[in-house]
Regions:
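Positively charged, small/polar-rich N-terminal and surface patches that mediate targeting and assembly
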Residues: 1-109
Length: 109
């Protein structure tokens, strides 16, 4: 795998009612190879108010070259005004898994 095709992990919190549709859309479009969905409880401030919400955390794996397209897709499908979308590079991993992520995501938008 070329260095330009490194893998990233994208984290996104989303209402539980939207998580399956979001995960399915990202995988079916081949923007990501895999999405894990984990129930979480989020505490934060929004518009000056303390908030707490049950949500789902999506953990998506994709190629670095697909990160911006994935973020754009998440933004377009997400119901929040300012969704949490964070991409972090994978600095090491099991080579066969990383190769699988590379193979299962499309090469360009």
């Amino acid at each position: 795998m070329e260095s330009s095709e490194k893998i990233v992990v994208i984290f996104c919190t989303i209402p539980a009612s939207e998580s399956e549709a979001m995960a399915r859309a990202l995988v079916e479009r081949r923007l990501v190879a895999c999405v894990n969905v984990i129930p979480v409880y989020s505490y934060y401030r929004w518009n000056g108010e303390f908030c707490s919400e049950p949500e789902h955390l999506l953990i998506a794996k994709t190629k670095r070259s697909m990160a911006e397209a994935t973020i754009a897709a998440i933004k377009s499908l997400h119901s929040y005004e300012v969704p949490e979308i964070i991409a972090v590079p994978v600095i090491a991993g099991y080579a066969p898994y990383l190769a699988w992520v590379h193979a299962e995501t499309k090469d360009e938008v």
